[in-house]
């Protein structure tokens, strides 16, 4: 649950900063405008807007809910997570990067609209926890699932980028 909270709070803050600094020709300049655009644009009706709308409803990174979720996730990622493995001499944690993306049937075919996955149904991402703990994460191609690419992550202790690159090569 904390992963989703961190995602939606950070998504709003970071996307608003990006859009505000984007080229003047860019029509969508904020998350609020993105939500409005997605509700009107037919191409966007394929996707559930739950995460975008949840992000838009957040209040900011000083919200106690966000602060608590971030502190919990950092603790679980670092001292209670990857740090323990690295303390035992593990050189790299090897894990799938995340779950595969969903297939989108071509427009005009049965099942073109993608149903929203129930909230909280996605497994936690090892990549996000590595980022929270400040650990490098190198992703390499692992294969395909239903014709879509999937990745394999090599997560190492701080400053192990050279070793991870050597392993991946």
Task: State where each predicted segment sits.
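Short, high-confidence coil segments that cap the C-terminus of an alpha-helix
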Residues: 90-91
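Structural helix-boundary/capping segments
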Residues: 17-21, 126, 131-169
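Second-shell loop/turn segments in exported
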Residues: 2-5, 68-70, 115-116, 152-154
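Short, surface-exposed loop/helix-turn segments at secondary-structure junctions
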Residues: 67, 102-127
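Short helix-loop capping/hinge segments that flank enzyme active sites or metal/cofactor-binding pockets
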Residues: 6-78, 141-149
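Stable alpha-helical elements in mature extracytoplasmic
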Residues: 11, 78, 82, 163-167
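Short glycine-rich anion-binding loops that position phosphate/pyrophosphate groups of nucleotides
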Residues: 21, 98-101
